[in-house]
Amino acid sequence: MIPELGHLALILALCLALVQSSLPLVGAWRGDRQWMSLARPAAWGQFAFLAFAFGCLTWAFLRDDFSVAYVAGNSNSALPWYYKFSAVWGAHEGSLLLWALILGGWTFAVSIFSRQLPEVMLARVLAVMGMISTGFLLFLIITSNPFSRLLPQTPMDGNDLNPLLQDVGLIVHPPMLYMGYVGFSVAFAFAIAALLGGRLDAAWARWSRPWTLVAWAFLGIGIVLGSWWAYYELGWGGWWFWDPVENASFMPWLVGTALIHSLAVTEKRGVFKSWTVLLAIAAFSLSLLGTFLVRSGVLTSVHAFASDPERGVFILAFLLLVVGGSLTLFALRAPVVKSQVGFALWSRETLLLLNNLVLVVAASMILLGTLYPLLLDALSGAKLSVGPPYFNAMFLPLMAALMAALAVGVLVRWKDTPSRWLLGMLTPVLAASAVLAAAGSMYFGDFNWAVLAVFLLSAWVVLAGFRDFLDKTRHKGVLAGARSLTRSYWGMQLAHLGIAVCAIGIVLSSQYSAQRDLRMSPGDTVELGGYHFLFDGAKHHEGPNYTSDKGSIHVSRDGKEIATLHPEKRLYTVQSSMMTEAGIDAGFTRDLYVALGEPLENGAWAVRVHVKPFVRWIWFGGLLMGLGGALAALDRRYRVKVKTRVREALGLAGQGA
């Protein structure tokens, strides 16, 4: 009975999504306040029904209701309860329900926290989000019903959750990623609402920017968590492989980065209006593209769900409808938007435009490398692999250029900057950066161009931010000046610091990582990176739904024991799947990483040993960026509720459409 109630809740949520997407939009066109007022209760009801449906599916998993096909295919009575909970979104149907729930949550949040918006603007925004919900709920109910029953024959037990997903990473990574993916629908909805209203001015940018910052922060942290999960779970010691589905999440993040900067220019200076709308459309369209790649069956990836062609066709049609419809509306409305505001070559507007171009080119390069092999295969049947050499060769120079421009962009002023003043600001920053880069490079011994470059660029970014802070607080004192600066400013500084930290981690871990693949018997030792690894053998271990051989490796340096690592080779009994669990000793400046390979004769094992310096800085930098975005979204000016002022800015007071 509970699964049937969940299915009914999905149908009712779809009905409310249809109401939300149509009547408020018609009301905005006709100037009918009663019809526009339906947007909020429809959004609330839709979210409530989606939450109820999600609760019903969770109940089915926790109660081992194997009469539900989705539960039988992705759970087992021996599965720990916390993995049963995360299994709710561990495969196609449940992950799509989570997507719909999060979209309903974003819609609910917009309806609650945007009361200061003019009613006509809010009605359009919620209507657009209702259209997106309608598409996903139709897809969910028609092709991917998570409540389908296996009747009259119900299995005694389930097939178990994919062993690769029986990890804490599944609990946190997909929800964070989906919060970012779906969050870009808010910026998309604001952009479409502005196009429908025919007014692309600073007001829509001001109100969509905090939502975009939060979505960008969630997506960035989700990507970081996915990288961390792959690093420790897959046993190969890497943190990024340019997998097509990794790329599918990275592309909207890059375009979203361009969007939050372009929104700032539109909000403060009233320029880049059409370009900002186009970025909002692109960011959400790339999120939908990621959904298509994961669920269409066109990819073979650890991230991809097995799927039938009907699902792929449905998502592709929805993607084309969203992209085609929004671009058509953009083509009709955007040409009439003109900006009378000018700016000089050396201005913040110019540097932010350069920022946007670099980020969009980077995303386009990744899009080309991701889709070209798929298109070639579809059109000619030829197989082509585009791997890390292509992406690294194209992406890294662009990021170096971005970091070089970033420091200048922080220091230049809006509209125009005297060149003599700018030179006086940049010269000491460049000199100090060169000194720090040389010192950092010498600390690591042998000269390395990549290391020198990353230290120079990172110091350039950090010191430019510090120089800007000193300039802004010079008349108030450091402490008083720091308190007077906005959260948006501190969020920017934190995010830029995260870029520098992440860049250092990427280069140092790639340049100085050491690895050995070898055969080790009990008592064997190996020296690597100044560390001494002693293999004590492996012992049999029984888990809740698996058996394993757990190794014991003692690590010492200069005669002092540092850690004992316990890598495992697990056999999950239900699916007879063998999995590798790495043994890791994490440190601020290095990771010691050991993975077991295959068992050999006489108690010996194939063992892979890594010493990975500064690898944690990659994820620490990513977290700093995400926290910076979240802090900027909490800026006081985004919470000021002055409804009349907003109406006047939008030019919508007293208008019906």
Swiss-Prot record:
Keywords: Cell inner membrane, Cell membrane, Cytochrome c-type biogenesis, Membrane, Transmembrane, Transmembrane helix
Pfam families per UniProt: CcmF_C (PF16327), Cytochrom_C_asm (PF01578)
Key word Mitochondrion present: no
MF annotations from Gene Ontology: catalase activity; heme binding; heme transmembrane transporter activity
Keyword Iron-sulfur: no
GO-annotated cellular components: plasma membrane
Matches recorded under InterPro entries: CcmF_C, Cyt_c_assembly, Cyt_c_biogenesis, Cyt_c_biogenesis_CcmF
Localization, UniProt: Cell inner membrane
UniProt record, GO biological process: bacterial-type flagellum-dependent swarming motility; bacterial-type flagellum-dependent swimming motility; cytochrome complex assembly; pyoverdine biosynthetic process; type IV pilus-dependent motility
Membrane topology of this protein: Multi-pass membrane protein
Transmembrane segments: 8-28, 42-62, 94-114, 122-142, 176-196, 211-231, 245-265, 274-294, 312-332, 356-376, 391-411, 421-441, 444-464, 488-508, 614-634
General function of this protein: Required for the biogenesis of c-type cytochromes. Possible subunit of a heme lyase.
The family this protein is said to belong to: Belongs to the CcmF/CycK/Ccl1/NrfE/CcsA family.
NCBIfam families in the cross-refs: nrfE, PRK10369.1
Protein name, UniProt field: Cytochrome c-type biogenesis protein CcmF
Organism in which the protein naturally occurs: Pseudomonas aeruginosa (strain ATCC 15692 / DSM 22644 / CIP 104116 / JCM 14847 / LMG 12228 / 1C / PRS 101 / PAO1)
